[in-house]
């Protein structure tokens, strides 16, 4: 289930032609270039799905403020009622322990989702990715392959297959003078991709990388089948990586230390 998908064409219409100033620092494919477009998406969702839409840190602040009698990280963690969502959305023990009205959470770049939509105990985690179509570039980091493997394991262990989606909105833009102009968008659902086709860049902190526009959406199995298929893919890739690392970085030097 996606709250975004039914209104995607409206989002697309709003974004196409939108201009934002190019960043004063960083690359045109970096976080600074994509953030203004993410803010436009958030603004649209907040105006049209106001009761559902949060930044991840806003949701955590709201959850804890609605439960003022719950204190301490262990008690606050139980508010999630889901080990998988706890893993994906929570902050660390110390930060959760020390949270208060005077010490609210703030946005972190490594939050799992740019935007969180919540209704009837279902969560849609949305990441907004920007693509510079002016030149060919490496696909962006999407999510840690290890983090996704941990997520899949928790889904299977706790039989939590219908609580959340992880989806992506790509904003394709090009440079026009001092502006970045949106020329097209794409929307894709992670759990509709073919798990065995996800590219893991082990040299880039084990990040899964893809352009949203290019992500296959043909997977028709259950969520449990997706999770198991991804774990098989991850383990196979990790084993191959381990063999490669040993062959390259261990075997040539082992004779010097024996």
UniProtKB/Swiss-Prot annotation:
Signal peptide: none annotated. The gene is hincIIR. GO terms for molecular function: DNA binding; type II site-specific deoxyribonuclease activity. GO terms for biological process: DNA restriction-modification system. It comes from the Bacteria. InterPro entries: DNA_rep_MutH/T2_RE_sf, Restrct_endonuc-II-like, Restrct_endonuc_II_HincII. Its EC number is 3.1.21.4. Keywords: Endonuclease, Hydrolase, Nuclease, Restriction system. It is an enzyme of class 3 (hydrolase). Pfam families: Endonuc-HincII. It comes from Haemophilus influenzae. It catalyses: Endonucleolytic cleavage of DNA to give specific double-stranded fragments with terminal 5'-phosphates. This is Type II restriction enzyme HincII.
């Amino acid at each position: 289930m996606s709250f975004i998908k039914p209104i995607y064409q409206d989002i697309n219409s709003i974004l196409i032609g939108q201009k934002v100033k190019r960043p004063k620092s960083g690359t045109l494919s970096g976080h600074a270039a994509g953030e203004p477009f993410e803010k436009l998406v958030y603004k649209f969702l907040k105006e049209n799905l106001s009761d559902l839409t949060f930044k991840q840190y806003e949701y955590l602040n709201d959850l804890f403020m609605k439960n003022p009698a719950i204190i301490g990280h262990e008690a606050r963690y139980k508010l999630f009622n889901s080990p998988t969502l706890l893993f994906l959305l929570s902050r660390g023990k110390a930060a959760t322990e020390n949270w208060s009205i005077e010490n609210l959470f703030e946005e972190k770049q490594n939050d799992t989702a740019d935007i969180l939509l919540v209704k009837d105990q279902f969560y849609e985690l949305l990441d907004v990715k920007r693509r510079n179509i002016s030149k060919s570039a490496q696909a962006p980091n999407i999510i840690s392959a290890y983090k996704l493997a941990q997520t899949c394991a928790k889904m299977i262990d706790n039989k939590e297959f219908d609580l959340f989606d992880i989806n992506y909105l790509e904003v394709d833009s090009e440079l026009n003078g001092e502006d970045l102009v949106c020329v097209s968008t794409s929307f894709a659902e992670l759990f509709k991709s073919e798990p065995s086709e996800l590219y893991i860049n082990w040299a880039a902190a084990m990040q899964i990388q893809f352009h949203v526009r290019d992500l296959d959406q043909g997977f028709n199995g259950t969520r449990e089948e997706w999770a198991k298929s991804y774990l098989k893919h991850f383990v196979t890739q990790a084993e191959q990586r381990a063999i490669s690392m040993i062959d390259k970085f261990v075997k040539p030097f082992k004779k010097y230390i024996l």
